[in-house]
Swiss-Prot record:
NCBIfam families: PRK00136.1. The gene is rpsH. InterPro entries: Ribosomal_uS8 (IPR000630), Ribosomal_uS8_CS (IPR047863), Ribosomal_uS8_sf (IPR035987). Keywords: Ribonucleoprotein, Ribosomal protein, RNA-binding, rRNA-binding. Part of the 30S ribosomal subunit. Contacts proteins S5 and S12. It comes from Sodalis glossinidius (strain morsitans). PROSITE patterns: RIBOSOMAL_S8. Belongs to the universal ribosomal protein uS8 family. One of the primary rRNA binding proteins, it binds directly to 16S rRNA central domain where it helps coordinate assembly of the platform of the 30S subunit. This is Small ribosomal subunit protein uS8. The keyword DNA repair does not apply.
Length: 130
């Protein structure tokens, strides 16, 4: 059986891994997943990530904790295969009044809501992370 929403699966693996106090989670890799992992690392939500394997690449995320608690409080899928959510640059959301990030897929690549506002770009809202 094929996976219907690989991004939702990635976010669920992160959520479940942190709930179980895992040090790392692994999943099948894709360019979009690597771009999201790179953003999460830049914003300080995960320690690190790496892609292993040539024929079937696997993405491994090293989860981050602060004083024994997960750094990621909430991670929520917004745009999904059955209902895509697009916003113009003026309508981009602020997650937790700027404390979290919205991951946006734009014509210039995957970026945070802050970077998209600065670049004057709108796009598909992939997920919220706080």
């Amino acid at each position: 059986m094929s996976m219907q929403d690989p991004i939702a699966d990635m976010l669920t693996r992160i959520r479940n891994g942190q709930a179980a106090n895992k040090t790392a989670v692994s999943m099948p890799s894709s360019k979009l997943k690597v771009a999201i992992a790179n953003l999460l690392k830049e914003e300080g939500f995960i320690e690190d990530y790496k892609v292993e394997g040539d024929t079937k690449p696997t993405l491994e995320l090293v989860l981050k904790y602060f004083q024994g608690k997960p750094v990621v409080e909430t991670i929520q899928r917004i745009s999904r295969p059955g209902l895509r959510i697009y916003k113009k640059k003026d309508a981009l959301p602020k997650v937790m009044a700027g404390m979290g990030i919205a991951v946006i897929s734009t014509s210039k690549g995957v970026m945070t809501d802050r970077a998209a506002r600065q670049a004057g770009l709108g796009g598909e809202i992939i997920c919220y992370v706080a």
